[in-house]
């Protein structure tokens, strides 16, 4: 029986009381070095043999059976906990590693509310039971992450390409692990693609793996098999698919590396891959000028769940849900996450919904803005406030993607498929960097939500993000006006060349304007003492006039209003305190109202 393994590590700083109380039980040091471990009873599950006695320093395992609709979230064990869920989604094996003393352990379980039924659709249930499997979800996100599929169903000679709301594939498609809006009675059907005939591949055996050296077929759609000649396919060598006249390539799970020039000068238009592919670079697709779409299916557990990168997809969920409604979208990097009280904007502009799409300034803004634009309509408002310390990214000049781009896509890879790869560079090199970055990270699950953690990754009792996407953990004012970092930023005309930054951001703004979307430029907050020596008052006046004359959208705010004493900043030189965010929001509301009133009078 195939199992999906989730390895989670729980670290708790223990306060040793005289009584020896730990967690839910009592710590006892036994002369015979024996430890008595008990899994406590609770709602939603049953434990087989809940009491065990083992030698100190050894592992102890338990089998837990979940009730219908329940999910096991973890335990309060202080050490490393290994949780293995069988494909029936009800039987769970818990292994507590290196127990050193006696204690009772609490299991954390919660009842799922949202049922999705998965249909094998000519595939086979891995558990050998029914061709349909129902899974219940907690609904921690506005949309629900689907099953990765490969842990539910299999089909000899086929690769699962995704899910669809109709068996014949004519309904709504969703990638494995990506998100879908839930509705009662939702059924998702596995979508299968047959492997391309083995005779079309030339390969050799290397260390027990198949290495593809050439493709001799002429199919418009190629599905590279998971195995050839009974050997798992691991690598696609240089030039293997060079000059191939095909439109679609599907890389099956298990393929580890795509070497440089593997698809050089092919007619490839769209590519499917799984997130267990580790080594790949843009050299593999050199001169593939027609490649525009990348579909990524999840097969690995997520690493960035609960991280601020993960907030992008939660914000994107809200944006999608408001696609047909009138809205104001706030954008830049983390200064926008920290810098607005969106409820105030909502109240001030009651005809509009509000979405805060700010996440991270040091990743290219261009792909983020393109995804945002796809969800906006005529009459909507984009309020952009680029961060000057990341100007090459924030002004859409940087076309190279990076690891953070994919970190923001991890919990919904389908969003990335909405981008046209021809508008960007270093796509696959960035994906490889993302894979390297998360290689040694603790793996989590999609039910973990960023709003359960603060900016530093600590659990919080109240949600850290509100419905709009603002970071709302209380941030007191500082006691010092001094900058946090020694990073003086240039607020000078020379720092924003027209042929690079201005022309690039204007080109992106024009795409919004062409759709009838109103775009306004305001300034991101900054500690006024964290500017370069060249950024004098006179130079800042010149810069403000420069933006007003060169940008193709209205500059609605005064630059000087964006410079704050350090008292109103928190932790960095551009993250506002709670009070600072309210002060800034009041100013922006005033500026936006004046601009809209001015336009009404024209």
Regions found by a protein language model. Give the residues of each.
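Secreted/periplasmic serine-hydrolase-like ester/acetyl group-modifying domain
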Residues: 399-515
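Structural signature of tandem-repeat unit edges
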Residues: 200-207, 217-234, 244-257, 266-279, ...
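Secondary-structure capping and domain/repeat boundary segments
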Residues: 24-73, 77-194, 295-298
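Gram-positive cell-envelope targeting signals
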Residues: 1-32
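Membrane-embedded segments
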Residues: 327-414
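C-terminal regions of proteins
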Residues: 534-602
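N-terminal secretory targeting modules
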Residues: 298-326
């Amino acid at each position: 029986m195939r199992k999906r393994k989730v390895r989670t590590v729980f670290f708790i700083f223990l306060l040793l009381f005289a009584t020896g109380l730990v967690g839910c039980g009592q710590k006892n040091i036994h002369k015979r070095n024996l430890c008595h471990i008990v899994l406590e009873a609770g709602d939603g599950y049953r434990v087989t043999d809940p009491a065990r006695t083992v030698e100190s320093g050894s592992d102890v395992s338990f089998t837990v059976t979940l009730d219908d609709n329940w999910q096991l979230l973890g335990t309060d064990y202080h050490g490393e906990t290994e949780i293995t869920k069988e494909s029936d989604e009800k039987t769970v094996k818990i292994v507590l590693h290196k127990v050193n003393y006696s204690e009772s352990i609490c299991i954390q379980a919660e009842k799922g509310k949202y049922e999705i039924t998965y249909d094998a659709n000519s595939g086979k249930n891995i558990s050998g039971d029914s061709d349909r499997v129902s899974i219940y979800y907690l609904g921690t996100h506005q949309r629900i992450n689907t099953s990765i599929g490969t842990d539910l169903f299999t089909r000899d000679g086929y690769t699962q390409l995704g899910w669809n709301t109709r068996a014949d594939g004519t309904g709504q498609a969703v990638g494995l692990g990506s998100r879908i809006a839930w509705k009662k009675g939702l059924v998702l059907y596995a979508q299968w693609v047959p492997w391309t005939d083995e005779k079309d591949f030339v390969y050799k055996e290397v260390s027990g793996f198949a290495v593809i050296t050439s493709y001799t077929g002429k199919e418009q759609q190629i599905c590279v098999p998971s195995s050839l000649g009974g050997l798992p396919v691991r690598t696609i060598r240089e030039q293997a698919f060079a000059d191939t006249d095909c439109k679609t390539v599907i890389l099956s799970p298990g393929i580890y590396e795509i070497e440089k020039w593997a698809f050089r000068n092919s007619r490839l238009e769209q590519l499917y891959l799984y997130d267990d592919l580790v080594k790949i670079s843009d050299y593999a697709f050199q001169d593939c000028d027609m490649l525009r779409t990348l579909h990524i299916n999840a097969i690995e557990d997520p690493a960035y769940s609960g991280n601020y990168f993960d907030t992008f997809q939660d914000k994107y969920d809200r944006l999608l849900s408001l696609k047909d409604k009138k809205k104001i979208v706030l954008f830049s990097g983390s200064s926008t996450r920290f810098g607005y009280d969106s409820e105030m904007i909502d109240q001030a502009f009651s005809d509009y919904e509000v979405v805060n799409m700010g996440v991270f300034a040091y990743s290219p803004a261009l792909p983020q803005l393109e995804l945002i634009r796809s969800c906006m309509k005529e009459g909507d408002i984009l309020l952009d406030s680029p961060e000057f310390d990341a100007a090459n990214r924030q002004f859409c000049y940087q076309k190279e993607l990076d690891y953070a781009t994919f970190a923001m896509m991890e919990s919904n890879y389908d969003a990335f498929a909405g981008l046209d790869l021809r508008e960007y560079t270093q796509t696959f090199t960035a994906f490889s960097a993302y894979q390297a970055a998360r290689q040694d990270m603790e793996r989590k699950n999609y039910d973990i939500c960023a709003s359960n953690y603060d900016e530093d990754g600590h659990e919080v009792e109240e949600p850290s993000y509100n419905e709009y996407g603002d970071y709302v953990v209380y941030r007191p004012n500082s006691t010092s006006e001094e900058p946090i970092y020694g990073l003086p930023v240039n607020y000078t005309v020379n720092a924003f060349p027209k042929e690079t930054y201005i022309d690039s951001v204007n080109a992106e703004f024009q795409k919004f304007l062409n759709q009838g979307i109103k775009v306004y430029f305001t300034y991101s907050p900054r500690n006024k003492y964290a500017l370069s020596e060249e950024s004098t008052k006179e130079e800042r006046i010149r810069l403000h006039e420069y933006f007003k004359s060169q940008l193709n959208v209205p500059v609605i705010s005064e630059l000087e209003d964006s410079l704050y004493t350090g008292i109103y900043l928190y932790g960095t030189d551009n993250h506002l305190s709670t009070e600072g965010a309210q002060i800034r929001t009041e100013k922006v509301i005033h500026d936006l109202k004046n601009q809209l009133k001015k336009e009404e009078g024209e």
